[in-house]
Amino acid sequence: MEAEGRSERGKQKKGRLCGSLWPDSYPAAGTLTSTVDVSPQPSKNLSGVGVRRPRLSPQGGQRGRLHSRRRHRTTFNPGQLEQLETAFGRNQYPDIWAREGLARDTGLSEARIQVWFQNRRAKQRKQERSLLQPLAHLSPATFSGFLPESPACPYSYPTPPPPMTCFPHPYNHALPSQPSTGGSFARPHQSEDWYPTLHPPPTGHLPCPPPPTMLPLSLEPPKSWN
C-alpha cells in the first residue's frame, strides 16, 4: 500500500512540474494536435498573398530586346542610288575623303555611305558566287559539246610561187668609153633615168639591179719624177 501511495505522489509531482513548464498561453496537448491537422488551403492563400517577384514573360523579354536592337533603315532616292552606283563603278573601296565628298553630294551621312558600300560589295560577291556555282559542277566533256567540230584540213596553205627569173635591165649594156685629152678616159655619162619604166614588169619576174659602174684605168705610162 505504501508503494502505491508513493507512485501516485510521484505522478502528481510530475504533473505539477509539466504544468509549470507549459505556460498558460499554450494550449493543452490535445488541442495542439487538433490545430496542427489543418487543410492546405490557408497555406495556398498565404503564398498567394505573399510578396511576389516581378517576372517577365518570354515574349515580353524578346520584344524588349528586339526593340533595343532594332535599326533604322535608310531609304535612298533614285538620284542618290545613281550617284552611289557611279562611285562604286569607279572605286569599290573609297577612302574617307571620297565618302565625305559623296556625303556632301547626296545629303547622306558618311557612316550611311560606308554601310552602303559594305552591303554593295557583299551583294556583288554573292552574285559572283551564284554565277560560278553552276559552272563548277560541269565537267570538261560537257564543254566539248558546245565547241564546233574541227574539219580534217582546217587550214589550207598556198603553194609557194615559182622562183623568179631576172631579166637583164635594158640599160645594163656596156657603154663605149671615150678617151679624154687629159690622157685618161672620162667617166661615161649615164642616163639618170636608169630606173625601170612605170609599166609593171611581168608577173612573177623582177628586173635585176644594174651592175656597178667600172671606172676606166689610165693608159699612159707613169711619168718619172726625175
Swiss-Prot record:
Summary of the function given for this chain in its UniProt record: Possibly involved in the ontogenesis of pituitary gonadotropes, as well as somatotropes, lactotropes and caudomedial thyrotropes.
**Annotated organism of origin:** Canis lupus familiaris (Dog)
* Comp. bias regions, Basic residues: 64-74
| Compartments, record wording | Nucleus
**InterPro entries linked to this entry:** HD (IPR001356), Homeobox_CS (IPR017970), Homeodomain-like_sf (IPR009057), PROP1 (IPR042412)
Keyword hit for DNA-binding: yes
Which Pfam families does this UniProt record tie to the protein?
Answer: Homeodomain (PF00046)
What gene does the UniProt entry assign to this protein? Answer: PROP1
The name on file for this protein is: Homeobox protein prophet of Pit-1
Q: Name the family.
A: Belongs to the paired homeobox family.
